[in-house]
Amino acid sequence: MEYNKLYFNNELSMCRFTYIYMRGPFGRYTTSITPKGERIGHIWISRSIDLNEDMLEELMVHEMIHHYVQTIDGVSFDGLFQHGRHFVRQIKRIKKRYGLVIWVCCPHWHFRNEKPKYSLSSKVIGYLRNNLHLF
């Protein structure tokens, strides 16, 4: 995959990919363990949001960072919502080396046919996650 080569030096193993309707998160990463003990990653992308090319790249790389943390770093629990120290380290590396900004959450995105809602609490949570990397 192009992003694996560009951002992860082709270190990532293949993982499953599903494009599915999800009302909650825009993307999700899960793993399963094979009978041989191998960890298999699965990236889920929501089709309930209109993604342009830049958004898709950001979302895919975000989920690939989860894949990296679990399969390369070998860390199965990385802080609250899996956006801890190992995840943030990869965000900073990618931003510094390639200029790509990966958000922990994307408060500026919204679902199809839904007007964006920017409550004070969502702005505060977005700031704490993205700027301070608290969770």
Task: Please give the residue ranges for each predicted region.
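Active-site recognition of the HExxH zinc-binding catalytic motif
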Residues: 58-71
